[in-house]
Amino acid sequence: MFPEYDVIVVGAGHAGCEAAAAAANMGSKVLLATMNMQTIAQMSCNPAMGGVAKGQIVREIDALGGLSGIVSDKSMIQFRMLNRSKGPAMWSPRSQNDRHMFAWEWRMQLEALPNVDFWQEMISGLIVKNGKVCGVRTGLGIEIPCKSVVLTNGTFLNGIIHIGEKKLGGGRTGEKAATGITEQLVELGFESGRMKTGTPPRVDGRSLDYSVMQEQEGDENPSKFSYSKQTTSLTKQRSCHITYTNQAVHDTLKEGFDRSPMFTGRIKGLGPRYCPSVEDKINRFAEKERHQIFVEPEGWNTVEVYVNGFSTSLPEDVQYKAIRKIAGFENAKMFRPGYAIEYDFFPPTQLQLSLETRLVKNLFFAGQINGTTGYEEAACQGLMAGINAHKAAKDHEALILKRSEAYIGVLIDDLVNKGTEEPYRMFTSRAEYRILLRQDNADLRLTPIGYEIGLATEERYQDMLLKKHNSEKLVEEIKNTKIKPETANEILEENGSAPIKEKVVLYNLLKRPNMEVSLFAEKVEEIKTLIEPYTQEEIEQAMIEVKYRDYIDKEEQMALKMTQLENMALNPDFDYKKIQALSLEAREKLSKLKPATLGQASRISGVNPADISILMIYMGR
């Protein structure tokens, strides 16, 4: 009934879709197995992509040849570049999306790939022979052979939904949980744990009073995620709105605490620290008089609204009473209550940096199964697992991105070397090379890698080379352009910058704070003519290069030093217990995690700089 597939992907959420698309586009014959083909690529929580650090990840996925950026652009209803008031390392693209268009667009992208087959059924087990996965077993007992497997189970592994004192099995509201895989993996020697996440109620937008809320419009000149010509920026957008909780809301919520599964101890799993439930917020931050609520439309042509900031597992009657005390929500009609969900995950220290498991060869994990939270975090893991599952099926060397190359590299390195006790989400602060890892240069960093492995297209590669050439050419032209005091001083003084007394190179003026080439182009014909041939993206790239070159140089030097440690390979079979000079914790952690390089060893929690020095001495370095 089934051929032997190169790659079988279990689960069709954000991670599974990226994994299937990547492996298929690289030439693998792929089977994407899902319990329900009507729920492929669901936005289970908020209808948005990107945000701080997450937007950089979406652009990195796109630069490598993944599809999340294209799908996000095609389903976008609003675009905002966050943190524009800060330096470019902090700029983060974010979109509001049409939930149904997003899922539909993902399905269209997958169905357009001849190498992807679909199968609708629960996968209940793996076929493992001699320590290597060689197929999957379905709930009906069908065995499907393959060379590698990617597990992207999301919140479905033994999922339990909590609403007040009610508890029901499920991986998402209205969908059953997945069973069998956790139990088999534990039998094989894997360690498992439980995590929790939650979602807010959805309400009828027709019942809200937006006049008392603060409107939050999209950017005046919206950008997009994808570097591809397949997508265009929005010409019209839908607004979001901001309102706040108040003391009456808090008091009403507190009335339900005795029936809250979080406070009564029925929920054992840890929830996401940076996306707490509303009851957790008012309990932990009792001194705060109000908490911000973002009112987000679910799409172009729907009245359904997502109440961002009001995630809860309190009883539905308490949710209803409390939500109606928020300004603008006095007459709110609820479509469905919020809920919490508990699910199995597997501590990611059981993985290699390729996302292949240490215990079972050619078996890869991606997404929430690894303890992460967020669509973007899941999608990038799916992309890397799909790439490496394809490579494993073909007996090729795995692709591993460095911390200095991508936020994706930071995320996977953190998971594998440090593990996580709570749902992990990405922040710019987690990256030590964030000036190198900007959202504007993801294509310059990663498209050459995507092209080399056969994922990014020739057209994308040539577009990247053209952008690189043109932005470098513009920087050189700026360095060779001199500007007279009588031309420059008016512009300088208008923008609070000291005047000049003699001809100055434009490059030096643009290094000053608040000085942009566009300010000079508005008033100086020569400079207007200079930048006219270039795209906005090329101009922005050149300006970042002009202003931040000194900082970029410093980070590149730091990254080079770390690369030297990364190039010092460690024997995976080395016996660390015999080096008594190492701390006991270092011996235990190094023996368990078996780092591939000295650089990886240096980032393991519990391994200190003294331990690394001892290893270097032992290696004769």
UniProtKB/Swiss-Prot annotation:
One of its GO terms (biological process) is tRNA methylation. PROSITE patterns: GIDA_1, GIDA_2. Keywords: Cytoplasm, FAD, Flavoprotein, NAD, tRNA processing. One of its GO terms (molecular function) is flavin adenine dinucleotide binding. GO terms for cellular component: cytosol. NAD(+) binds at residues 271-285. InterPro entries: FAD/NAD-bd_sf, GIDA_C_N, MnmG, MnmG-rel, MnmG-rel_CS, MnmG_C, MnmG_C_subdom, MnmG_C_subdom_sf. Its cofactor is FAD. It holds the Pfam family GIDA. It is found in: Cytoplasm. The keyword Flavoprotein applies. FAD binds at G11, A12, G13, H14, A15, G16. The keyword Cytoplasm applies. Belongs to the MnmG family. NAD-binding protein involved in the addition of a carboxymethylaminomethyl (cmnm) group at the wobble position (U34) of certain tRNAs, forming tRNA-cmnm(5)s(2)U34. NCBIfam families: mnmG_gidA. Homodimer. Heterotetramer of two MnmE and two MnmG subunits. This is tRNA uridine 5-carboxymethylaminomethyl modification enzyme MnmG. The gene is mnmG.
